Amino acid sequence: MHKKDFHYELPDALIAQAPLPERSAARMLIVDGHQGTWEDAWVRDLPGVLRPGDLLVLNDTRVLPARLQARKTTGGAVELLLDRLLDARDGWFLAKSSKALRPGMSIHLPGGAVATVEEKDGMDVRLSLPADVAWLPILEAGGSMPLPPYIRRAAEASDRERYQTVYAARPGAVAAPTAGLHFDTELLDALAARGVERTFVTLHVGAGTFLPVRSEDITEHPMHAETMEVSATTVAAVAAARARGGRVIAVGTTACRALETAAQGGTLRPFTGETRLFLYPGKTFQVTDGLLTNFHLPESTLLMLVCAFAGMECMLAAYRHAVAEGYRFFSYGDAMLISPQAGRR
């Protein structure tokens, strides 16, 4: 299966550069993978589209202000983008500087703390802090929100709120689980009143989510690692939804990948650890009955995931429809609600 099979043409004008004034005001393309059909709707229609007894599974990761402007001891500028924290004082960062960083070098951070380069792997460096210093306060005080590269503007103060879900609780992500950005308290309340239940998983989205697929044969793509947790509470909520005949609706590809990782043995079980799960056409889904997601980049692993879920022909045709109808694409863009093709559950 080739990378070029997942290409589509997208005018730059359709890439959303800022959020809508209201979170739930986005459009929503409802895609039926079994029938191969779609219809235009709005995110605010969700309470009427979902059924009492359905279960929404949301990712409660919290995006860190993960981009830091730092300096070498010589005064040279270093831009750091957190990939993942290993513990309170240790983490991997993507580093950009005029000259390569080397193990043993000191990096001067906003606020005066000094980190040490411990390891280097390509453009990634592992940085450690002294025993009395932690990364989270440094990032919160001196970092900026890590907007994706296709948003061609500097992060603003408002992005600290809008590039974050209203239910974000567990710090650790460097990119938002963007399907969740559409939910405001009014929409969540309306869904609860409808009888739609909700539960949470955690998947800390890493910087690797923006890495392109470089191999022409997509099965050779090395998937990046991300830390995640599916709790016993969530496993019980999924079992209860099944027992009452409800559907399990993953809010975002991150929630979907977390659920499917925890069900790799065929049964959903509590799971804490790393995932490198890559879902592409031919793979099956053990848990996910429906998927709410944004529109994804051409030839990306996330587009491959939704093609696996709803079928390539249906999904790529739905994308062409969305382009023709002027939908807004990517992180701050519109949404899709997808049901699976036959045999994918």
From Swiss-Prot:
Gene3D superfamilies in UniProt: QueA-like
Cellular compartment(s): Cytoplasm
One CC-aspect GO term: cytoplasm
Pathway assigned to this chain's UniProt record: tRNA modification; tRNA-queuosine biosynthesis
Keyword S-adenosyl-L-methionine: yes
A GO term, aspect molecular function: S-adenosylmethionine:tRNA ribosyltransferase-isomerase activity
Primary location recorded for the protein, binned into one broad class: cytoplasm
EC number: 2.4.99.17
UniProt keyword Ubl conjugation, yes or no: no
Reactions listed under catalytic activity: 7-aminomethyl-7-carbaguanosine(34) in tRNA + S-adenosyl-L-methionine = epoxyqueuosine(34) in tRNA + adenine + L-methionine + 2 H(+)
Keywords: Cytoplasm, Queuosine biosynthesis, S-adenosyl-L-methionine, Transferase
One Pfam match: Queuosine_synth
Family the UniProt entry places it in: Belongs to the QueA family.
Free-text function comment from the UniProt entry: Transfers and isomerizes the ribose moiety from AdoMet to the 7-aminomethyl group of 7-deazaguanine (preQ1-tRNA) to give epoxyqueuosine (oQ-tRNA).
NCBIfam families: PRK00147.1, queA
Name listed for the protein in its UniProt record: S-adenosylmethionine:tRNA ribosyltransferase-isomerase
Organism (species): Acidithiobacillus ferrooxidans (strain ATCC 53993 / BNL-5-31) (Leptospirillum ferrooxidans (ATCC 53993))
